């Protein structure tokens, strides 16, 4: 009788089973960082250790999220209280990402508003030919804003139980995302300056490249959601996996708007 009483859960939270993935992820992170340092300093075995850590992290990401999906979909462990906790976790994660980009914008405004004498005392620097904002950057802005609209369309379709429309919305979003990444790569290949061309190149490639990395991550996120939607993993009430992906994608949209308005447009037109 006592053992039966102990099995009754008297709270709405999910107590996860013991898992090896936190430890394996920590070991993968150690291999990734330590191997990266060894590789950059040309030590023997650094590249192998770096690859081992990278593929370990990828494996843990796949298996850990697989377990989370199983707990939500097949075990019914994601109650309303659990979903609220997941939402708060995603919000805090996005806030931490905002802090990353805040540092890049800080570096840009520090360098552009008060340019030092060794770059000519002007912004853009005298030896740098800046990229016009009205070419590929403007096209990429249209692509990302359109993708934000299409992912919202998919979200409303999921809430309304319209699976076919949701699939169409996600497919359009993925097409826009892939086109954005391709255009960004094309822009980099034809850029008249590189990352080593002073503070302008460093700030430009760090900010836009880090954003491009987030676009790739968001594209993978949405692609996984498309597969899960096809497999009928989402319902009108339970679709936080997609909701998190949509939040992340809107965050990517907003960051790009700030990048376009500051680094591309304002940074191209100012003469300090």
From Swiss-Prot:
Q: Report TM segments.
A: 20-40, 45-65, 89-109, 128-148, 166-186, 204-224, 248-268
One GO MF annotation is: cytochrome-c oxidase activity
Q: Which InterPro entries match?
A: Cyt_c/ubiquinol_Oxase_su3 (IPR024791), Cyt_c_oxase_su3_dom (IPR033945), Cyt_c_oxidase-like_su3 (IPR000298), Cyt_c_oxidase_su3-like_sf (IPR035973), Cyt_c_oxidase_su3_a-hlx (IPR013833)
* Compartments (UniProt record): Mitochondrion inner membrane
Note the subunit structure: Component of the cytochrome c oxidase (complex IV, CIV), a multisubunit enzyme composed of a catalytic core of 3 subunits and several supernumerary subunits. The complex exists as a monomer or a dimer and forms supercomplexes (SCs) in the inner mitochondrial membrane with ubiquinol-cytochrome c oxidoreductase (cytochrome b-c1 complex, complex III, CIII).
Q: Which UniProt keywords apply?
A: Membrane, Mitochondrion, Mitochondrion inner membrane, Translocase, Transmembrane, Transmembrane helix
Query: What does this protein do, in the record's words?
Result: Component of the cytochrome c oxidase, the last enzyme in the mitochondrial electron transport chain which drives oxidative phosphorylation. The respiratory chain contains 3 multisubunit complexes succinate dehydrogenase (complex II, CII), ubiquinol-cytochrome c oxidoreductase (cytochrome b-c1 complex, complex III, CIII) and cytochrome c oxidase (complex IV, CIV), that cooperate to transfer electrons derived from NADH and succinate to molecular oxygen, creating an electrochemical gradient over the inner membrane that drives transmembrane transport and the ATP synthase.
Regarding the membrane, this protein is recorded as: Multi-pass membrane protein
E.C. number(s) listed in UniProt: 7.1.1.9
Q: Name one Pfam family in it.
A: COX3
| The protein, known as | Cytochrome c oxidase subunit 3
Cellular component terms per the entry's GO annotation: mitochondrial inner membrane
Top EC class, one word:
translocase
Principal localization? mitochondrion
Q: Which family does it belong to?
A: Belongs to the cytochrome c oxidase subunit 3 family.
CDD domains linked to this entry: Cyt_c_Oxidase_III
Q: Would I find Membrane among this entry's keywords?
A: yes
Protein species of origin: Pylaiella littoralis (Seaweed)
Protein's UniProt keywords contain Transmembrane helix: yes
BP GO terms, sorted:
mitochondrial electron transport, cytochrome c to oxygen
Reactions catalysed according to its record: 4 Fe(II)-[cytochrome c] + O2 + 8 H(+)(in) = 4 Fe(III)-[cytochrome c] + 2 H2O + 4 H(+)(out)
């Amino acid at each position: 009788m006592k053992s039966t009483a102990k099995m009754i859960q008297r709270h709405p939270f999910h107590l996860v089973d013991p898992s090896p993935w936190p430890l394996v992820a920590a070991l993968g992170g150690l291999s990734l960082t330590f191997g990266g340092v060894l590789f950059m300093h040309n030590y023997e075995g650094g590249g192998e250790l770096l690859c081992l850590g990278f593929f370990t992290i990828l494996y843990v990401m796949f298996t850990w999220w697989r377990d989370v999906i199983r707990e939500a979909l097949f075990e019914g462990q994601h109650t309303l209280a659990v979903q609220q906790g997941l939402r708060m976790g995603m919000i805090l994660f996005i806030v931490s990402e905002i802090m990353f980009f805040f540092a890049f914008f800080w570096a840009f405004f520090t360098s552009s508003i008060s340019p030092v004498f060794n770059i000519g005392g002007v912004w853009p620097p005298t030896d740098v030919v800046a990229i016009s904002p009205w070419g590929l950057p403007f096209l990429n802005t249209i692509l990302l804003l359109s993708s934000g609209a299409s992912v919202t369309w998919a979200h409303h379709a999921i809430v309304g139980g319209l699976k076919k429309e949701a699939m169409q919305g996600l497919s359009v979003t993925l097409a826009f995302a892939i086109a954005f990444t391709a255009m960004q790569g094309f822009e980099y290949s034809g850029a008249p300056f590189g990352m080593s061309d002073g503070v302008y190149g460093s700030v430009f490639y760090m900010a836009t490249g880090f954003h491009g990395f987030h676009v790739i991550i968001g594209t993978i996120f949405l692609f996984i959601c498309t597969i899960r939607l096809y497999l009928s993993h989402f319902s009108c009430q339970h679709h936080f996996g997609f909701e998190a992906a949509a939040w992340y994608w809107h965050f990517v949209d907003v960051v790009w708007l700030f990048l376009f308005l500051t680094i591309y447009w304002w940074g191209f037109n100012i003469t300090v």
